[in-house]
């Protein structure tokens, strides 16, 4: 059922960062493939070190299927289905019953926070991270010797937030009252060299959204948002909440029909979870406490980045959230039925709202129009001239003109670099005051792609 819920993603075209990743991964030599995994910056490097789930992913599917996003999406959904199977298996191992495992899988599978991870192809790294992290954890709990280390390395190659895995394993051992530091040593021997190479050789990402803020209050605010998103709040809600968690006036005008549904269902779910938590207060064991701690630990890489909070970061943390909620719920009966109805109603309705508002959908539509237009009308790049998208509609603000909307959808010049197979090809946008080349200008209407 969750696969059916997110199956509309199959129709979503490439957009934004997808084009950059397609361009970088379009290699022709074996040495370029090895560049994917190098910690030394090179032409095949991207902003983050995620070679397995980004460069290799885009390279393999582009090589097999060209610029056709459907096979990419089929693979992503297949991996998501496999991650649900792994969640069921791990939950059964930790919570001992099929009923609890099924509850966890339902909660995770229908969560609206999965939207970005499944609709935006460049977010596939989160799905890969979840798969390899869960395989590592399960193999570790089964006392496998080498397999969990291999999966840990694959998780690190998927996304850097896998660095919390050894700490997750430590907490799971603590929950069993059986901590073996020697057993964790191999993970540290992998982790410390990785951290050195990742931070000091590959380097860190700069930018306003990646500035660390050690403020406990900011971290608490960020944690609250990840909890709200885990319950089912739409990601867009963060843009409409002011000081004291009060909705700003624009929230009610932008969502006249939706705001009662959003707030009503969210409050209902939070109230019911609060009731279940209070009901079991004082009767919690180490296992439940470990799930709460693991939720926070999994968020540590982003918890102190208040300007960089997004639902796609919930891939691994959501696993522990669902485990904790399942721990609060009975295995059958009216209470379970009531909560599942409330939870599914919130998340299914927010999935519908998110589809109508999410950038991956809107930008995908624009990007497809641009790609098809230029494939038909300019299948070969014109000589001694350049394209410039102009602002020919007043629908958008001065700061976010129509040409900027196009630029955000196609990744600036990246779509054209893929289309014309030229790593250095540039197009221009009226909103961006760049120096134009001394060539003939070909103005392109932005309006025709935004209708």
What positions do the PLM features span?
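Polytopic membrane enzymes that build or remodel cell-surface glycoconjugates and lipids
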Residues: 1-451
């Amino acid at each position: 059922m969750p696969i059916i819920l997110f199956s509309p993603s199959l129709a979503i075209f490439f957009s934004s960062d997808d084009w950059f990743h397609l361009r970088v991964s379009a290699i022709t030599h074996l040495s370029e493939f090895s560049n994917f995994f190098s910690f030394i910056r090179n032409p095949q490097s991207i902003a983050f070190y995620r070679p397995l789930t980004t460069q290799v992913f885009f390279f393999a599917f582009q090589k097999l299927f060209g610029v056709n996003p459907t096979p990419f999406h089929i693979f992503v959904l297949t991996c998501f289905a496999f991650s649900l199977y792994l969640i069921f298996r791990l939950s059964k191992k930790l919570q001992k019953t099929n009923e609890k495992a099924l509850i966890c899988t339902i909660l995770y599978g229908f969560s609206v926070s999965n939207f970005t991870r499944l609709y935006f192809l460049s977010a596939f790294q989160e799905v890969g991270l979840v798969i390899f992290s869960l395989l590592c954890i399960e193999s570790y709990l089964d006392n496998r010797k080498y397999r969990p280390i291999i999966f840990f390395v694959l998780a690190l190659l998927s996304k850097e937030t896998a660095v919390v895995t050894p700490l997750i394993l430590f907490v799971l051992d603590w929950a069993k009252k059986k901590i073996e530091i020697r057993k964790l040593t191999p993970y540290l021997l992998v982790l410390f060299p990785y951290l050195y190479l990742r931070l000091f050789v590959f380097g860190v990402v700069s930018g306003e959204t990646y500035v660390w803020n050690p403020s406990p209050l900011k971290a608490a605010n960020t944690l609250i948002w990840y909890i709200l998103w885990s319950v089912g709040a739409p990601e867009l809600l963060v843009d409409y909440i002011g000081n004291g968690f009060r909705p700003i006036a624009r929230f009610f005008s932008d969502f006249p029909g939706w705001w009662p549904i959003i707030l009503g269902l969210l409050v209902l779910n939070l109230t019911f979870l609060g009731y279940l938590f209070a009901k079991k207060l004082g009767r919690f064991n180490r296992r439940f406490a470990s799930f709460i701690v693991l939720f926070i630990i999994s968020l540590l890489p982003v918890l102190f980045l208040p300007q960089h909070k997004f639902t796609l970061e919930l891939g691994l943390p959501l696993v522990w959230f669902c485990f904790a909620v399942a721990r609060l719920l009975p295995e059958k009966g009216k209470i379970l039925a009531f909560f599942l109805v409330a939870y599914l109603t919130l998340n299914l309705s927010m999935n519908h709202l998110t589809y109508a508002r999410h950038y991956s959908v809107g930008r995908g539509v624009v990007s497809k129009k641009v790609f098809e237009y230029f494939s038909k009308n300019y299948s070969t790049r014109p000589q001694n001239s350049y394209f410039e998208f102009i602002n020919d509609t007043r629908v958008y603000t001065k700061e976010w003109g129509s040409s900027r909307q196009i630029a955000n959808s196609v990744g600036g010049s990246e779509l054209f670099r893929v289309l014309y197979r030229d790593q250095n090809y540039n197009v221009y946008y009226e909103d961006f005051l760049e120096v134009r080349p001394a060539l003939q200008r070909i103005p392109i209407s932005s309006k025709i792609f935004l209708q």
